[in-house]
């Protein structure tokens, strides 16, 4: 049994259930906070085969991936690949994944709203934040459309 490789249909990496049929980069990209490019960089740094399916990973490879994904900064990847550079409180370059990423994003929006910045005000009123037009798009409710005359 030692030489036999078993296929797992669902693999848990970084607290996320990943479909075993996916190739490694696409499987890792299904984790929130990790895109295809970051996944490929991590795979190359660990010396894994990008064509390998997630279900064929050994327990040791899963453990190594899990360990590295908890702190991607230890791999020495370029800073532009991180998703949180120059953190507001610490000033450090971080790479967040999963619920931690959601928590930090929500906290940033709350801070913007509290200080009363333009972005914060737009968020507070539920309007578009990034300069999109609002005259015709982004209307909430009012979905009657055209009514036939009786």
From Swiss-Prot:
Coiled coil: none
Segments passing through the bilayer: none
Gene3D superfamilies linked: 1.10.8.50, 30s ribosomal protein s13, domain 2
Listed GO MF terms: rRNA binding; structural constituent of ribosome
Keyword terms, alphabetized: Ribonucleoprotein, Ribosomal protein, RNA-binding, rRNA-binding
GO cellular component, one term: cytosol
GO terms (BP aspect): translation
Subunit structure, interactors included: Part of the 30S ribosomal subunit. Forms a loose heterodimer with protein S19. Forms two bridges to the 50S subunit in the 70S ribosome.
Family named by the database record: Belongs to the universal ribosomal protein uS13 family.
Function: Located at the top of the head of the 30S subunit, it contacts several helices of the 16S rRNA. In the 70S ribosome it contacts the 23S rRNA (bridge B1a) and protein L5 of the 50S subunit (bridge B1b), connecting the 2 subunits; these bridges are implicated in subunit movement.
Protein name from the UniProt record: Small ribosomal subunit protein uS13
Native organism: Aeropyrum pernix (strain ATCC 700893 / DSM 11879 / JCM 9820 / NBRC 100138 / K1)
Lineage: Archaea, Thermoproteota, Thermoprotei, Desulfurococcales, Desulfurococcaceae
Gene that encodes the chain: rps13p
